[in-house]
Amino acid sequence: MRYLVFQLTLHGMKQRRRHIPRLKLMTLVILLLTIIAWVAWSFWPSSARQMKRSVGIVACQSWYEMVCKGKTILYFADIATDTALVRPSLQQDSCVRTTYSTGVWVNRYAFIPSCRGRMITVMAKPDEINRQDAWTLIEKEKERNEKRIRQLRDQLKELNYYLRINNVHDEGYNTVAAYAYEKEAEKAHCIRLARLFDTMRQADRPQLIRKAVYTAYYRLPNGECQQVRMREVGSSKQCQTVLLQTIGRTTPTGVAPLSIFFVNGKANGTALAVGYGGLGVEELASSDASCSIIPTTLHDNRHDLPAVLGGDGSPVFSTSGYFIGITKGNEVITRSQLRDLLRKEEQP
């Protein structure tokens, strides 16, 4: 009896040994087929629907803060070409500047679903301002402000003189009175700024810091518009590209991230672009814009897409649906340049 049990046990062990290589082989075959299917799917061109689902609108709300002794004492929207501070204010809300561009959802790795909320857009970022340059800007702005106060005082003298000698309260009188009231308020604002500048010293080492808040707008398959907060995780000064990622590091539902392969797409011939109408024109830009597919022609990585049909950041595809790059001005930023940006991602 014992011998029979021993023989049965031995036979079972031999059978299991035969099955183990088969199981490994089957697992290997399934894994290999899965990899082949995934690579083939990755190389599969985008459909028109997927092209539209790969884009979103990026809204950048930016402003500058003047920080002195660790405290923010002044806000302004931008720095003009003549170094003037644009819309300086004691309140942040009155100097926020909003710019729009097209963003493209992307995978970090070509053959792996690795988007995790990553988006690439084109947006110029100004250089950082060192402390010495900051003090120079402050001194120049102080001089401009004092000059503006003198101009406003002269204007108000003339306006008040007109109001005194023309005391008939007709339509013309009311218009001038309202204008004088606006100038009086502007003078009061400039005087408050002058008092602030008078309290500042170079020894206080004031700083000018740029702040930016990014929001991505995208549409669900049913057309409903959604928005999600983004953070900057990388940028390229040369290409003026910015790599963004959702705060939660998750890919929104309904979007179709693009994979950026290792070989650049074609540089000449007919192509397709996905653009938001009006987004490339400051007066028409809005987060409510809808995207469309527009034909274009490439010549040495340059396109002929009008800005009113597709602004910076619009993705360009071959007529077969393969991703080529994104627009910046009348140029196309290539896949290799976009891959370089993904390599610069800052790790949390």
Residue ranges with predicted function:
Residues 1-13:
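N-terminal intrinsically disordered, acidic low-complexity segments at the extreme N-terminus
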Residues 77-86, 289-299, 348:
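Short, positively charged
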Residues 35-48:
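Membrane-interface motif at the C-terminal end of an N-terminal transmembrane signal
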Residues 43, 98, 223-225, 231, ...:
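Flexible, gly/ser-rich surface segments that form the specificity/activation loops bordering the active-site cleft
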Residues 50-58, 96-101, 106-109, 114, ...:
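Extracytoplasmic
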Residues 110-123, 178, 182-268:
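Conserved active-site neighborhood of the chymotrypsin/trypsin-like protease fold
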Residues 11-32:
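N-terminal Sec-pathway targeting helices
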Residues 55-204, 313-317, 323-331:
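Catalytic histidine site
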